[in-house]
Structure formats: C-alpha cells, structure tokens
From Swiss-Prot:
Alphabetically ordered keywords of this record: ATP-binding, NAD, Nucleotide-binding, Nucleotidyltransferase, Pyridine nucleotide biosynthesis, Transferase
Stated name of the protein: Probable nicotinate-nucleotide adenylyltransferase
Family (UniProt): Belongs to the NadD family.
Organism: Mesorhizobium japonicum (strain LMG 29417 / CECT 9101 / MAFF 303099) (Mesorhizobium loti (strain MAFF 303099))
Pathway entry: Cofactor biosynthesis; NAD(+) biosynthesis; deamido-NAD(+) from nicotinate D-ribonucleotide: step 1/1
NCBIfam families with a match to the protein in the record: nicotinate (nicotinamide) nucleotide adenylyltransferase, PRK00071.2-2, PRK00071.2-4
Domain of life: Bacteria
Keyword Glycosyltransferase: no
Keyword NAD: yes
Amino acid sequence: MPHAEKGLTVGLFGGSFNPPHAGHALVAEIALRRLALDQLWWMVTPGNPLKSTRELAPLAERLQLSEQIARNPKIKVTAFEAAHHVRYTADTLALVKARNPGVDFVWIMGADSLRDFHRWQRWREIVLTFPIAVIDRPGATLSFLSSVVAKTFDYARIDEGDAPLLARMRAPAWTFIHGPRSSLSSSAIRKMAKG
C-alpha cells in the first residue's frame, strides 16, 4: 500500500484496468486537478466480482501497463489488494482507512460504474464511509441521474464547484464532475484485439 502522510488528500481509483488505457489516465488527471488531491492511488484489482475473469489479463501485466500510462508523479499505481487477499471494495476501503489515520480519502469512479454500484457488496457502507467523486464518461452523463445510488443519496450531492472540498467532507458526500471524456473502453479494446 502506498504511503500518505497525515493531513494529505488522496483519491482512490480502483478497477481491473483490463487493459488500462488513456481514458483511465484522463479520469485520474481530472480527479487530481478538480478535487485538488495530493495523491491518487491507482488500485489495480485482482478481479471484479461482478465481471467474468475469463478474459482477465494477469495482474502483473495490468499493473505494468498501468504504470506506463499513469505518468504523473502524484499517481501511485498499486496492487495491494492481492497482497492482502481483499476481494471487495468495502473491505479495501476499510483496510485503507484503518492503516492511514489522519489521511482524507475520496473514492473515484467513472459514471458508467455508478449504474451498477448498488450491486456492489455493502455499497451503502461505502457511501456512508467515503466521499465519492463520479467522473463523467461517454454515454453515462444522463444515466447516472437514474441510478439507485444517485436517487438514494441525492441529499448528499454537492455542487461540482465545491469538488476541491470533497476529500475533507464527512460522508455521505458526493459530486459529479464534468470534463473532457474519452470514448476508449477496456471491453472495446479487448474486442478489437480479438480481431
């Protein structure tokens, strides 16, 4: 797990990154800038419990490719979930919080992930524990509004203009961040690679 000093603001950007691409790097850069973060931990997960592992590239390969794409020195690429045998995001976030007292974290996710977020194990616990930044993705700008999470926690949504304050806010708190979007997707890249 990367190190963060007390008082820092750190974004947590997790995913299978199968494969990582410039769109992921764009999300990371937008989050760093718009949330005024000191660091961003790019967390390459061993696998997504909601997705098939049939086409999942080896973790070492996804980790190496992520390091090549994430060039900003504020971005720390890690696969600590595998070392700690953590499978679910709620467990990962609990571990991160327990090991880093005094650090202000914000969970970062693409708007496309918000659609199914209510299917994640202990999703309410995640929302009630960590501020969340939802970054715009092509085709997901409007659908996020109808998501279970957006409806359930509409009262906790903060204005996008207040995004730099999010990491220091007490959960539940979340925002939707508009910005440049990349049409790249890992599933489309895998499909093209198959021919």
